Regions:
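Phosphate-coordination loops involved in phosphoryl transfer and adenosine-cofactor binding
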Residues: 5-8
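Short acidic/polar segment at the start of the alpha1 helix of CheY-like receiver
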Residues: 16-20
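Charged docking surfaces used in two-component/phosphorelay signaling
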Residues: 21-29
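Acidic, metal-coordinating helix/loop segments flanking the phosphotransfer/catalytic sites
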Residues: 36-56, 96-97
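Acidic catalytic/metal-coordinating carboxylates
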Residues: 38-42, 67-72
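Active-site residues of response regulator receiver
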Residues: 60-61
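Alpha4 helix (beta4-alpha4-beta5 surface) of REC/receiver domains from two-component response regulators
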Residues: 67, 71, 78, 82-110, ...
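The C-terminal output helix
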Residues: 123-127
Length: 127
């Protein structure tokens, strides 16, 4: 049985602050607890502080020059193996992004997206 939104913590990571705020606002409106980060280093700091609480990582695929969303997810899984991940990106046409998503059988949502599409994906990932 999955947790209710009020018992679920989601970390949102994207180098575009507008996307972070958009996703956080949608999720908070549904009752989710949200942690926000713009870069991988912020996300890693937050994950160290909240590692037992983070249920879902929503991350951009291509972020900062230090780490991709895939690499960030790998790092977080070392701390919390059961963390779920939803990748978001506006660069699906990029062959590397497509290969990485398909090879991991990952859950992916292409930007731009509608709020209801985001919520459906999140519910699906958490189920």
């Amino acid at each position: 049985m999955s947790k209710s939104p009020s018992q679920t913590t989601v970390m949102v990571v994207d180098d575009d602050q507008a996307i972070v705020h958009l996703v956080a606002g949608i999720l908070e409106g549904e009752g989710y607890r949200v942690l926000q980060a713009r870069h991988s280093d912020e996300a890693l700091d937050l994950s160290a502080a909240y590692k037992e609480d983070i249920d879902l990582l929503v991350t951009d695929v291509k972020m900062d020059p230090f780490m991709t969303g895939f690499q960030l997810a790998q790092c977080l899984r070392l701390m919390r193996v059961e963390i779920k991940v939803l990748y978001i990106s506006g660069f699906v046409e990029d062959e590397m992004v497509r290969w990485e998503v398909e090879s991991r059988v990952a859950t992916f949502l292409q930007k731009p997206f509608r709020p209801q599409d985001l919520l459906e994906k999140i519910r699906s990932v958490l189920a």
